């Protein structure tokens, strides 16, 4: 059938499995009633699509000092990135830091993300999952364009310092990271997250 010009294609939506979530809470010991932020620092195509780990670590330390739970999510391939972030957090501040990287299935990630007050992510698969469970998220873009791969949610916010599709070329990388992502400073991200937390949606 031919769709009408004003037909709106519904955005993806994912359902939570309460029984599985209950098992995850018991297994990992995090509290869904406490404020929590999920950090999704990985990206399929390596560092050119990732916000620098040193910047993620600054955000993690800020929220731990505010007594938030910080949950790091990703696949086994993201373990080195997650560990690099963990290593920048002092031992005494790690009580509320939960590193789920490589320990959960995609279905588990759906359930865990659904409990979070905020999600900070690169342009990645977990960004789209967070959007589909309708939680407040902040997505950081570098070489890719949110015009083509946006998080489909009214609760999503985006920061991008470059416009359009920015190919990763020689001279446009800083320590392996795309210059557009390197330009996004932790202070700006923290301010955006704080404002987003207070948004009435």
How would you describe each model-predicted region?
Residues 1-48, 86:
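Mid-sequence helix-capping/hinge segment at a functional interface
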Residues 53-142:
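Donor-binding and catalytic core of enzymes assembling or modifying cell-surface/extracellular glycoconjugates
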